[in-house]
Structures are given as C-alpha cells and as structure tokens.
Amino acid sequence: MKYLLAGLCFSVLLLSCSKEEVEPDFTGNKNREQGIFKVLTGDSVMEMNGDIVTATLTHFNDITAAFPTVRRINMLECPGSDDDETNVKIGRIVYSKNMHIHINDNGFAASGAVDFFLAGTKRTKGSNTNLGVHSWEDGNGTEGKDLPMNHPDHDLFLDYYVSIGMNSSDASDFYFFTLNAAPSSSIHWMTATEITQYNMLTN
C-alpha cells in the first residue's frame, strides 16, 4: 500500500482546486476504454491494467454507468495505488455492486491493488498469478509497521476492510500481516498457505 502525505507544499495548494473541481466523480464519458479499465465484447467483463490513481474513480464511475451490465473485473498487471483514499472509495463501490474480481493467467495484483481485489464478493485467480503485499511509508521515512497498533493512521485501511465484509478481527490480522510482510521499498508475494489463511479467494 502506498500512503500519501496528508499535506502538500504551500505553492501546490495555491494552484490546486478542490478534488471535485479537478477530478469529478462522474462526467458521463461513455467510452469502452477509460484509464486502466476496458470493457470487453459482450459488456459483462471489464479488464483492469495499471496503477490506481485519483482519476480512476471518475473512470470507474463513468464506465460502469455506461456499461451497467459489467459484473466481472479481470485484473492483468496491477502494481498498486497512488491514491489510497480513492482506492478505498472504488473498492466500496465494487463491493456494493457485488462484483466478481479475477486475476488473469500470468497476472498480478500488488500493494493497493490487493486491497481493490479484496472488494470482490467473488474472488478468483488463474494460473501463474501473484498477490503482493508490503508496508506503507509516509514520505518522511516512517513505516506503517513502526506505528503503534492503535495509531489513527491505520484506520483508513482497517475501516475499509470491515466495509467490504471482513470482521474486525480478520481485518486487523490481514492488515498487520501486510505491514510486517515487507517494507514499503520491497514486496512480499503471498504463499499459497497465506492466500488460504487470509481468505483471499472465495469458494
């Protein structure tokens, strides 16, 4: 998971508009391909390939409004998220839509993309796939794993996991596993045992 700084430098703030002005949640774009998403022939399956960024929320809302029959997302190569707050917003929408998320053969989800994957009410994967986790870092050298377990900076993720169907105990177990699995500068590819232990896939 990538953790973004809460504050930006003053000069950037002077030039910035509100999130709603810069990246509206919905624009009405009806294209089959928007950002990291592409609706396939038949309109029931959408591919996802790339990093989740701030604009991804708009792309997701637009493309699912234009193609409301999309029920499955096939993840290809998804390295993570550059905006964790946006990522959890999209994940909650995915969960509310009762979507199936599948990692394609030879594909992977890492970092924040694993959090996205967990939003699927049905979660499957093909062959030769990987799920990668690690700690986050706040930009000043502080790793999430180095903070006390009751630190409020953990709440974004813990609250998210509960909102997509985990009980609080499972949410805590998985989250702190990811923090201790690898530092933010590295990645831990989950073993088959870990994938089973943390219920990454649905039956």
Language-model segments: residues:
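Extracytoplasmic/secreted envelope proteins and their assembly/folding machinery
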Residues: 57-64, 87-91, 95, 114, ...
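Short, glycine-/small-residue-enriched flexible loop/hinge segments at domain edges that mediate gating
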Residues: 68-86, 100-106
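STAS-typified acidic loop motif
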Residues: 25-59
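Glycine-rich beta-to-alpha active-site loop
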Residues: 95-138
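Sec/Tat-exported extracytoplasmic proteins
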Residues: 56, 64-68, 77, 94, ...
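Bacterial Sec-dependent N-terminal signal peptides
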Residues: 3-6, 11-34
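Soluble non-cytosolic domains of exported or imported proteins
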Residues: 51-58, 81-88, 107-111, 125, ...
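Charged, glycine-interspersed solvent-exposed loop segments at helix/strand-loop junctions
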Residues: 72, 96, 140-203
